[in-house]
Amino acid sequence: MASPKVLLLLLALLVGQAPQHPPPYPRPGTTQVFENDVIAVWDVAWLKQKYPLHTHRYDLIGVSYVEGDRIITQGDAPGRLSSTKPWVFQSNVAGNTHVEEGASDPPMRAILMEVKAATPRTDVAEATDGLRQVVGAPSWENRRTFAWAIPPGTAAPTHRHARDAVELVFTGATPATTPTVTFVPAGTAHAGPVPEAGGRVFIFELK
């Protein structure tokens, strides 16, 4: 009979050889619009097809910009139909494994950002001229971001980013199209951005 140590070693080898699910992106309907060592930004459309089972490697944040439907299947549970309006903040967590399927035509579209740091920073001091101070409380937040939806027709006054940030600037096109994406390093002080008439701005400060 094999010793407990041998059994543990065999188990570790089996676990190490277990097939790994692919990451969610790239896949049909997605385009990477920006990447650095902090974040990867994807323009995602849920086409009318069933995507492979995948595991999210990173925490995910973002915002939808075209209304649409998805079917999300988690484990052995039946698929769940999810309908999403435009301009709704999105999130997911690292380690989540599921199947997605587009269920509408035209497809739902969103800008989704993979936050590469495994855990939020806890050593950030708020700037006295930060967005919270000059614009107000975030429109949305979770454990990985503070996010502001700047009202259409307005622009953020001069402010300083205490954290790395991503700005999404949408034109006034209907339906909405892929935004301009700008990475703003921590410590940057600036005004804006200023959208065109009918456009929208979303600012995500990364935790």
Describe the function of each predicted region.
Residues K5-G16:
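Bacterial N-terminal signal peptides
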Residues A110-M113, F146-I150, A156, L168-V169, ...:
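Fold-core signature of tandem repeat domains
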Residues V93-A118, R163, P185-K207:
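Ligand-binding loop in jelly-roll beta-barrel domains
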Residues F34-V38, L47, Q74-G95, T174-H190:
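Short acidic-glycine-tyrosine-enriched beta hairpin
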Residues A18-F34, V124-R132:
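N-terminal low-complexity, Pro/Thr/Ser-rich intrinsically disordered segments
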Residues P28-H54:
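Mature N-terminal segment immediately following signal peptide/propeptide cleavage
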Residues V99-P151:
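Surface-exposed beta-loop interaction hotspot
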Residues H56-I71, R160-P175:
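Short, conserved beta-strand element in jelly-roll/cupin
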